[in-house]
UniProtKB/Swiss-Prot annotation:
Keywords: Acetylation, Disease variant, Disulfide bond, Lipid metabolism, Lyase, Metal-binding, Mitochondrion, Peroxisome, Transit peptide. Pathway: Metabolic intermediate metabolism; (S)-3-hydroxy-3-methylglutaryl-CoA degradation; acetoacetate from (S)-3-hydroxy-3-methylglutaryl-CoA: step 1/1. This is Hydroxymethylglutaryl-CoA lyase, mitochondrial. It catalyses: (3S)-3-hydroxy-3-methylglutaryl-CoA = acetoacetate + acetyl-CoA. Residues 33-300 form the Pyruvate carboxyltransferase domain. Changing residue 233 to R: In HMGCLD; loss of activity. Residues 1-27 form a transit peptide. It holds the Pfam family HMGL-like. The modification N6-acetyllysine is found at residues 48, 111, 137, 179, 324. The lineage of its organism: Eukaryota, Metazoa, Chordata, Craniata, Vertebrata. Belongs to the HMG-CoA lyase family. Stimulated by reducing agents such as dithiothreitol (DTT). Changing residue 280 to A: Normal activity. The active site is at residue 266.
Length: 325
């Protein structure tokens, strides 16, 4: 870690030069991007070995100290289905709640929502998909039936003054159906928005998307849902996560999901990369002169901490590069 602290300033000295490069040919980019850190939940949920509650709490606290304004904390799902998230209440109650930072939690059903609120949650997340077959295989119902389940959560959230964020899985491709129609993604996203989700994250669940596919999908969705309500969630399975994110930024999206150290593999492509690494995202955004509010040095330290705890190498290219110097 000490070597990384010394190496970082030299490694990142080129950022000033990068900021000086004109981005006029890239279209209008947002001046500020909100990063939604999903590592503690999406990144850890499929870990085979149970991560201790104190480690999860320390990771989230370190991410808060790094300046991330939204940190997806845990999932209020049955431990029978996701053992890794069995300590959801202890984690949510145990973390430091930094002023100005949101700590949303996943709630797949009304029972999970009620438990989350009882534990102090102020924002919850619900998951849908743009693929009928994916929905059927994952939650054993149709897309329309899934929205009937979400309706109970959204109504309860409205009564309790709880914000709800939606996810649309398979926005750029499905492991079962293959290509997904942009019109279908737009339809599902519009439904989430009309039901009360303040923000909808469009997920490339298996990482097959390319900038061209991203552009076509967003073009369709933006005709149905306000741009300010959209976010993107890219996986790096085919090495396209940053490229797809940049395309979304060029189209005006200013909310991006990512995971510290790139935690979270793709369950449909064994050995493949998973979530976009937050470190790599921050490095790119800073190079474009886009404000994130994130301290990259502290973020790297958080990534190093969790990788040591998991006894694995980081998937972040920025972390790998700075540690080699």
């Amino acid at each position: 870690m000490a070597a990384m602290r010394k190496a970082l300033p030299r490694r990142l000295v080129g950022l000033a030069s990068l900021r000086a490069v004109s981005t006029s040919s890239m279209g209008t980019l947002p001046k500020r991007v909100k990063i939604v850190e999903v590592g503690p939940r999406d990144g850890l949920q499929n870990e085979k070995n149970i991560v201790s509650t104190p480690v999860k709490i320390k990771l989230i606290d370190m991410l808060s100290e790094a300046g991330l304004s939204v940190i997806e904390t845990t999932s209020f799902v049955s431990p029978k289905w996701v053992p890794q998230m069995g300590d959801h209440t202890e984690v949510l109650k145990g973390i430091q709640k930094f002023p100005g930072i949101n700590y949303p939690v996943l709630t797949p059903n009304l029972k999970g929502f009620e438990a989350a609120v009882a534990a102090g949650a102020k924002e919850v997340v619900i998951f849908g998909a743009a693929s009928e077959l994916f929905t059927k295989k994952n939650i054993n119902c149709s897309i329309e039936e899934s929205f009937q389940r979400f309706d109970a959560i959204l109504k309860a959230a409205q009564s309790a003054n709880i914000s709800v964020r939606g996810y649309v899985s398979c926005a750029l491709g499905c492991p079962y159906e293959g290509k997904i129609s942009p019109a279908k993604v737009a339809e599902v996203t519009k439904k989430f928005y009309s039901m009360g989700c303040y923000e909808i994250s469009l997920g490339d669940t298996i990482g097959v998307g390319t900038p061209g596919i991203m552009k076509d999908m967003l073009s369709a969705v933006m005709q149905e849902v306000p741009l300010a309500a959209l976010a993107v969630h890219c996986h790096d399975t085919y090495g396209q996560a940053l490229a797809n994110t940049l395309m979304a930024l060029q189209m005006g999206v200013s909310v991006v999901d990512s995971s510290v150290a790139g935690l979270g593999g793709c369950p449909y492509a064994q050995g493949a990369s998973g979530n976009l690494a937050t470190e790599d995202l921050v490095y790119m955004l800073e190079g474009l002169g886009i404000h994130t509010g994130v301290n990259l040095q502290k973020l790297l330290e958080a990534g190093n901490f969790i990788c040591q705890a998991l006894n694995r190498k980081t998937s972040s290219k920025v972390a790998q590069a700075t540690c080699k110097l």
